[in-house]
Amino acid sequence: MLTNASQVLLRNSDLFKDHSVLVLNYEGDTLPKALLESASSVSALALDFHHHLIMQPYAAKNLQLYFGHQLPTQECFDSVIVYFPKAKALAPYLFNLAGKHLKPQGQLIVVGENKGGIKSLPKQLPDYFDKAFKADNARHCIVFTSELNREAPEIKLQDWYSEYQLQTPQGEITICNMVGVFSEKKLDEGTKLLLENLPKMQGNVLDFGCGAGVIAAALLTAQPKLTLDCVDINAMALTSCDLTMQANGLSANIFASDGMAQTSGHYDGIISNPPFHDGLASTTNIATDFVKAASANLMRGGLFHIVANRHLPYSDCIAENFGEVNVSAENNRYKIYSNIKR
């Protein structure tokens, strides 16, 4: 099933007929494959690892699939399609990336939902693109087109992240935050409670949903002998975490994982401020799956140590998978669950 944005793109397939096409920031569907009905070849860069995995079975010579914050090649295309990002700060980066991978006078196509800020696109396009033209408006989505009028600037990573100091119970750390990765530029309340109650860990530890690497940097600062895996589903978060490790002179294994599917499965500890906060049924199911996977990936005697909004129903699934529920600390908003695998 294609998303509304993808459906609107496909009904404008004459825009990229017989073109070489690059798709940036595509959604969780098979749009890149569907484009081949009109395009001569398609390359697609996913910033969400789950979206990349959905497409992976369809990889072919004329359908090149990538995951990360940039393409591994310098290839240029007739058209670049950008899905307007939910994190608006990410949009200028995607436009720069599109510009660098367009042929001279190449075509930019931007699609997005009305409620996602796409209407403001004409004001957001950098001046190396011509004025945006509204090509279609349907299914609560808009398609804009534009043309590259001069060479886009080189992408220098240092232009696309902010660096700031963070005071933690483990000492001061430097955080590097790529555009599109949420940051309050201070220690959020949940992570603060987690780090104030940081236990002594040992061996191989997993930081699940590592984000920009706040927990990882604090943990390794206090306990440098740990072997730490940092996983996230978001390419910009993984790049942020890598930069944070470098800035603090720390070392960790940083890689993409859809849940825990790509992890080693043999950990002495799992630590996390899980990215499940809204309390919806779907979120509850994801949280339940997370606890189940954490138990399966822990060695006997391993420590499960997370912080969660106190209204989220973690207790039942922790009891089911760990035999008991141990709340080691709490305040009026958060609880620290700290359980040993028996």
Curated annotation (Swiss-Prot):
Compartments reported by the entry: Cytoplasm
Domain of life: Bacteria
This enzyme's EC code(s): 2.1.1.172
Classification via CDD domains: AdoMet_MTases (cd02440)
Main location: cytoplasm
GO MF, any single term: nucleic acid binding
A GO-annotated cellular component: cytoplasm
InterPro entries: DNA_methylase_N6_adenine_CS, Mtase_sm_N, rRNA_ssu_MeTfrase_C, RsmC/RlmG, SAM-dependent_MTases_sf, Small_mtfrase_dom
Enzymatic reactions: guanosine(1207) in 16S rRNA + S-adenosyl-L-methionine = N(2)-methylguanosine(1207) in 16S rRNA + S-adenosyl-L-homocysteine + H(+)
Keywords: Cytoplasm, Methyltransferase, rRNA processing, S-adenosyl-L-methionine, Transferase
TM helices/strands, residue ranges: none
Pfam families per UniProt: MTS, MTS_N
Functional description taken from the UniProt entry: Specifically methylates the guanine in position 1207 of 16S rRNA in the 30S particle.
Subunit structure: Monomer.
Record PANTHER family: RIBOSOMAL RNA SMALL SUBUNIT METHYLTRANSFERASE C
Protein family per UniProt: Belongs to the methyltransferase superfamily. RsmC family.
Protein name: Ribosomal RNA small subunit methyltransferase C
